[in-house]
């Protein structure tokens, strides 16, 4: 054991190699924003994505609620409406960003979560209108399967993925929720989750870059009996 230690010290890495290794291993952190209501996770996630791409983006409650007001086309059946991928994409575009949407099926999402028939109809109508606007603006909407490698590639190319998940794994209930895919490595993904379950001892620091295995993340990144999946890739300010 002593010989092994002496050998390790006798051949240190160069400063350049050590610096490169440190840079490679350092996860890319995104600024964290804690949603201020129980229905503005989509808006809070978009604020984190935009702020990560442009430090001039306002990072406050007024902006959060402005974004929520624009994107709230998923009627939850109780309480206030939440954000659809199409509403998030349009809110990003209005602020100079480009978005791309991946969905597991065509048309409106999370209709199964809407309990009242009239709210289901309203949500479907508004999402269809927003989807048409997204397509007219040239933002891609793609029905596709995806995995962690696809999100990691998009992140490496400069996009920030906002992902639909269930709250069951992180918070114990089972509600549709938006989070930010901040980074990943060979075994884990790192998520900025805008919701903080303070009764579980969670803090903003705990929910910033929160780790999950690839398998756990893929299991949580779906919702409802149809296993609906949705991702909104936010890309840098439009030139």
Indicate residue ranges for each PLM-predicted region.
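Short amphipathic alpha-helical segments and helix-helix/interface helices
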Residues: 88-89, 148-153, 179
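Hydrophobic transmembrane alpha-helix bundles
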Residues: 95-109, 137-149, 199-211
């Amino acid at each position: 054991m002593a010989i092994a230690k002496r050998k390790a010290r006798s051949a240190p890495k160069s400063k350049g190699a050590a610096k490169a290794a440190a840079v490679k291993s350092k996860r890319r952190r995104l600024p964290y924003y804690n949603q201020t209501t129980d229905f503005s996770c989509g808006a809070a996630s978009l604020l984190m994505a935009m702020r990560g791409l442009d430090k001039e983006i306002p990072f406050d409650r007024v902006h959060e609620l402005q974004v929520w007001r624009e994107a709230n086309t998923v009627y939850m059946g109780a309480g206030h409406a939440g954000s659809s991928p199409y509403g998030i994409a349009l809110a990003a575009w209005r602020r100079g960003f480009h978005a791309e949407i991946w969905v597991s099926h065509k048309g409106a999402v999370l209709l199964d979560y809407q309990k009242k028939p009239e709210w289901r109809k309203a949500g479907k109508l508004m999402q269809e209108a927003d989807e048409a606007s997204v397509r007219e603006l040239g933002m891609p909407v793609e029905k596709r399967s995806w995995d962690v490698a696809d999100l990691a590639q998009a992140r490496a190319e400069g996009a920030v993925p906002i992902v639909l998940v269930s709250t069951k794994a992180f918070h114990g209930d089972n509600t549709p929720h938006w989070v930010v895919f901040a980074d990943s490595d060979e075994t884990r993904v790192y998520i900025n989750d805008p919701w903080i379950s303070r009764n579980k001892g969670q803090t903003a620091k705990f929910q910033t870059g929160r780790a999950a295995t690839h398998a756990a993340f893929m299991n949580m990144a779906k919702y409802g009996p149809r296993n609906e999946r949705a991702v909104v890739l936010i890309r840098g300010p439009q030139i």
